[in-house]
Amino acid sequence: MKIAAERYRALGGNVEIILKPGCDHHPHSLDNAEPVVDFIIRNQPDYQKKQVIHQRGSLTNSYLKFAKEKKGCVAFLGGSITEMRGWRNMIQEDLKQRFPKTEFTFIDAGIPSTGSTPHAFRFENDVLQKGMPDLLFVEAAVNDDTNGFDYIRQTRGMEGIIRHARTVSPEMDIVMLHFIYDPFIPLLDKGIQ
C-alpha cells in the first residue's frame, strides 16, 4: 500500500489510509463508513473555501481534563441536526480515538425543530441534570430561522444558554455551531451572514 500511496501522491492525489480490522478489502462491510465519507467530502473542490470558523477562544480546559484526568463529559444541545446520526456521532468517535484512555459521558440533547430559545429553557433539565459538561456543543441556526423568533430573541436565547453554562461552570468549553440550509444559500451568495 505504501508504494501505491507514494505514487498516487506524486501524481497530486490525496491518500488517507483507513485501517478497519476484520473487513478484508470490502468497504461495504465497514461497521462505520464515516471516515470514508469524511475523506470524500474533505477532498471535494473548493471544500476549504466553504468552511467558516470564527475562533474566539480555545478548548484547553476540556483538553486538559480529557488528557490528564482521563474523564470527560461532553454535551450536545441542538435540534434535529444534532439529534440524528451525523456530526455529533463523528465528534464522539473522534474524541474516543484521540483520547482512548478517557472515560467519556456523552449527553445527547438533540430534539428536532428546536432552536436557541427552546434550548435556553431546556438546558437545565436536558443537559445539566444529566451531568456537568466539560465541553458543550450548541446548534440552533436552522431552527432559529424556522421557529419564528426574531433575531433579538434568538440572540437572547443563545446568550441565555452561554450565561447559564458559564454561571454553573466557568471552565466549561463551548462550541457554537451554525449550520445552513437551502434558504440561507442565497443570503450567503450575497455576502450576508
Q: What is the meaning of each model-derived region?
A:
Residues 2-47:
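C-terminal catalytic histidine-bearing segment of alpha/beta-hydrolase fold enzymes
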Residues 3-4, 31, 35, 39, ...:
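Alpha-helical elements of Rossmann-like donor-binding domains used by nucleotide-donor carbohydrate transfer enzymes
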Residues 7-10, 65, 164:
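Alpha-helical scaffold elements within enzyme catalytic domains, especially in hydrolases
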Residues 24-25, 82-83, 114-115, 143:
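Glycine-/small-residue-rich active-site loops that bind phosphorylated ligands and cofactors
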Residues 46-77, 81-104, 129-134, 193:
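N-terminal secretory targeting modules
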Residues 89-105, 109, 114, 118-193:
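Alpha-helical cap/lid subdomain in secreted, periplasmic
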